[in-house]
From Swiss-Prot:
<keyword id="KW-0472">Membrane</keyword>
<dbReference type="GO" id="GO:0009279">
    <property type="term" value="C:cell outer membrane"/>
</dbReference>
<feature type="signal peptide">
    <location>
        <begin position="1"/>
        <end position="21"/>
    </location>
</feature>
<dbReference type="InterPro" id="IPR011047">
    <property type="entry name" value="Quinoprotein_ADH-like_sf"/>
</dbReference>
<dbReference type="GO" id="GO:0051205">
    <property type="term" value="P:protein insertion into membrane"/>
</dbReference>
<dbReference type="InterPro" id="IPR017687">
    <property type="entry name" value="BamB"/>
</dbReference>
<dbReference type="Pfam" id="PF13360">
    <property type="entry name" value="PQQ_2"/>
</dbReference>
<protein>
    <recommendedName>
        <fullName>Outer membrane protein assembly factor BamB</fullName>
    </recommendedName>
</protein>
<dbReference type="InterPro" id="IPR002372">
    <property type="entry name" value="PQQ_rpt_dom"/>
</dbReference>
<dbReference type="InterPro" id="IPR018391">
    <property type="entry name" value="PQQ_b-propeller_rpt"/>
</dbReference>
<keyword id="KW-0449">Lipoprotein</keyword>
<feature type="lipid moiety-binding region" description="S-diacylglycerol cysteine">
    <location>
        <position position="22"/>
    </location>
</feature>
<keyword id="KW-0998">Cell outer membrane</keyword>
<comment type="function">
    <text>Part of the outer membrane protein assembly complex, which is involved in assembly and insertion of beta-barrel proteins into the outer membrane.</text>
</comment>
<feature type="lipid moiety-binding region" description="N-palmitoyl cysteine">
    <location>
        <position position="22"/>
    </location>
</feature>
<dbReference type="InterPro" id="IPR015943">
    <property type="entry name" value="WD40/YVTN_repeat-like_dom_sf"/>
</dbReference>
<dbReference type="GO" id="GO:0043165">
    <property type="term" value="P:Gram-negative-bacterium-type cell outer membrane assembly"/>
</dbReference>
């Protein structure tokens, strides 16, 4: 039986409940979210603009910044293009279906997927539907588009490439399904006519966009125990891709960086760090938010830890992002926590206007940080 894990740390909680029933855990309170103490706020986080776009968010929904616009979607079928300067809605399209992921933006298209296992391509300028096509099964990973292809990774881990012009299937790539997998904010990346995508059991592959053949493959994490839950080692978040290397994070695994030369990968460093949300990056520093709520900064060159903070233990953190020397991370109570990137000190805290947890990944832009909160509000914030 295939089981998909739907919350960031549901695997940990499920394991705790199981063992707790067997009286092996006596201190289940260790999984309770940390209570927040007052902090001395040395910065002020302001809302530049906000607009209501639909019905909240989910793990498969990630806003995208392109052409001075924010593109986003919500589970109720709403897809929008918003002016990044002022939050005005350029267009809003309501599809007659329930969506499972979005958005992918590229080749003049905005791509979403639905519960009927279909992908929809909308015109990025007008919001009008261009084409739709059937998938192997539903997809809860945001699609990606570019170089004449639309790429979808379905929940059976099949990667499919469709023609951007008409939605015709070009190729399909699949690996054996694991018993358990983590349903979280994993995303793909496009570079040099290749798509980089996570596949089961802690692996990341680069596939040629022309025919789906494997350019290279890395193993970011390995199973560490005998149980099915121990075997969950999925690569999470969006891989950090550089001209000569790639860095990944994984659940029950590591942050791992590789150098790439002539399609050959050489491990540079790895650091044990279990995450469900992926990495942030700025100025040769990698930032991570772990499954237990640790926020840490690592040197890109060698993985040395610059600083680490455990103030936000078990608070269901989002991916960390950087804007103008501050690190932003969201939590399960709809709060944004702001760190000084140099010292690792918490310098600010901000409510996004909803007590629901922030599930969609934070999006850094050159204008601030975009947040899609749990109540369907899209907003741009920044610290002053």
């Amino acid at each position: 039986m295939k089981l998909t894990l739907k919350r960031k740390f549901i695997a940990v909680l499920a394991l705790t409940s199981l063992l707790g029933a067997c009286s092996l855990f006596k201190n289940e309170r260790r999984f309770e979210p940390a209570k927040l103490a007052d902090i001395k706020q040395s910065i002020v986080v302001n809302t530049v603009w906000q607009t209501s776009i639909g019905s909240g968010g989910s793990a498969g929904f990630a806003p995208v910044y392109a052409d001075n616009s924010i593109f986003a979607a919500t589970p109720d079928g709403t897809v929008v293009r918003v002016n990044a300067e002022n939050g005005n809605i350029a267009w809003s399209t309501k599809l007659d279906t329930k969506l499972t992921s979005g958005v992918g933006v590229g080749d003049g298209l905005v791509i979403v997927t639905d519960r009927k296992a279909k992908a929809y391509a909308l015109n990025a300028q007008t919001g009008e539907k261009v084409w739709d096509t059937e998938l192997s099964t539903i997809s809860t990973m945001p699609p990606i588009a570019g170089f004449g292809k639309v790429i979808v990774r379905a929940d059976d881990f099949r990667v499919q490439a469709f023609d951007s012009k008409d939605g015709k299937l070009h190729w399909s790539f699949v690996r054996t399904n694991p018993i358990l997998s983590l349903k979280t904010n994993s995303r793909m990346a496009l570079i040099n006519n290749a798509v980089i995508v996570a596949v089961p059991t802690g692996k990341l592959v680069s596939l040629n966009l022309n025919d789906g053949t494997v350019n290279w493959e890395i193993h970011s994490a390995s199973a560490k125990g005998p149980s099915d839950i121990d075997s969950v080692t999925d690569v999470v978040g969006q891989p950090l891709v550089f001209n000569d290397g790639v860095c990944t994070s994984s659940y029950q695994g590591n942050i791992t960086c590789y150098s790439i030369k002539n399609s050959r990968l050489t491990p540079v460093w790895f650091e044990p760090f279990s995450s469900a949300v992926g990495l942030g990056y700025d100025n040769n520093i990698i930032y991570g938010a772990s499954i237990d709520g640790t926020v840490a900064a690592f040197s890109l060159a060698n993985g040395q830890i610059a600083w680490s903070d455990q103030t936000l233990i078990n608070r269901g953190l989002t991916n960390p992002v950087v804007y103008q020397n501050y690190l932003y991370v969201g939590d399960l109570d709809g709060l944004i926590h702001v760190y000084d990137t140099k010292s690792g000190s918490l310098v600010g805290r901000f409510s996004v206007g909803s007590s629901k947890d922030i599930v969609s990944p934070l999006l850094p832009t050159d204008k601030g940080v975009v947040v899609q909160n749990g109540s369907g509000t899209l907003m741009l914030i920044r610290a002053n």
